[in-house]
Amino acid sequence: MLLRTAAASASSLSLFSPNAEPPRSVPARGLVVRAAKGSTNHRALTGVIFEPFEEVKKELDLVPTVPQASLARQKYVDESESAVNEQINVEYNVSYVYHAMFAYFDRDNVALRGLAKFFKESSEEEREHAEKLMEYQNKRGGKVKLQSIVMPLSDFDHADKGDALHAMELALSLEKLTNEKLLNLHSVATKNGDVQLADFVETEYLGEQVEAIKRISEYVAQLRRVGKGHGVWHFDQMLLHEGGDAA
């Protein structure tokens, strides 16, 4: 016991002795401890060292010096720029048609306020889509070029279907047409390797477009069930109070 205590005391004292050697770690049984041959702190993970001041030179040469040229533009081809401008025109045209439908159903001798509300909101939504595309065009360094808008119809009555069903079927066709145009825009982006434009179309438009087509398809089916009579009034009331009571 005395020998063990003395050995333990000597070991304890050696920890505080300035001349004592540091304790040697003893590897666990079955393990082999090897010292690292060299530090890996400065090794490149891929074997390629990034040299920003060298690699940025070619980009620096591409920075425009004329005031008319965009400074933000990068990997944004003319075809993509034109396709975005075309989609802006599509959104504005559809918005204009929906606005005409709003005006029709808001007439005193038509008086379907729910349908008027629905088409007014739809018109505003399409205009927002156009404005979002315009903002994106500027963000990528493109130039917004607004095109002419076709004058829409002012009357939407139909002898066989009635005005509500006729207008809703037209709206469904417009949403499907808009979806086709968006898919074309996405194809242009994909063809030119513009992953940012493709992501923008996917994130901001395509999913929402599918939802709109489904919603209006259900409205068409419901209007076909109720016919042109009293059921249209009940359908209109549903739209009027959808999302909260109307003023």
Curated annotation (Swiss-Prot):
One of its GO terms (cellular component) is cytoplasm. Keywords: Chloroplast, Iron, Iron storage, Metal-binding, Oxidoreductase, Plastid, Transit peptide. Residues 1-40 form a transit peptide. Fe cation 1 binds at residues 91, 126, 129. The keyword DNA-binding does not apply. Residues 41-73 are annotated as: Extension peptide (EP). Residues 74-227 form the Ferritin-like diiron domain. It holds the Pfam family Ferritin. It is found in: Plastid, Chloroplast. CDD domains: Euk_Ferritin. Fe cation 2 binds at residues 126, 175, 209. GO terms for biological process: intracellular iron ion homeostasis; iron ion transport. Signal peptide: none annotated. Its EC number is 1.16.3.1. It comes from the Eukaryota. InterPro entries: Ferritin, Ferritin-like, Ferritin-like_diiron, Ferritin-like_SF, Ferritin_CS, Ferritin_DPS_dom. Coiled coil: none annotated. It is an enzyme of class 1 (oxidoreductase). The keyword Cell cycle does not apply. It catalyses: 4 Fe(2+) + O2 + 4 H(+) = 4 Fe(3+) + 2 H2O. One of its GO terms (molecular function) is ferrous iron binding. Stores iron in a soluble, non-toxic, readily available form. Important for iron homeostasis. Has ferroxidase activity. Iron is taken up in the ferrous form and deposited as ferric hydroxides after oxidation. Belongs to the ferritin family. This is Ferritin-4, chloroplastic. It comes from Glycine max (Soybean).
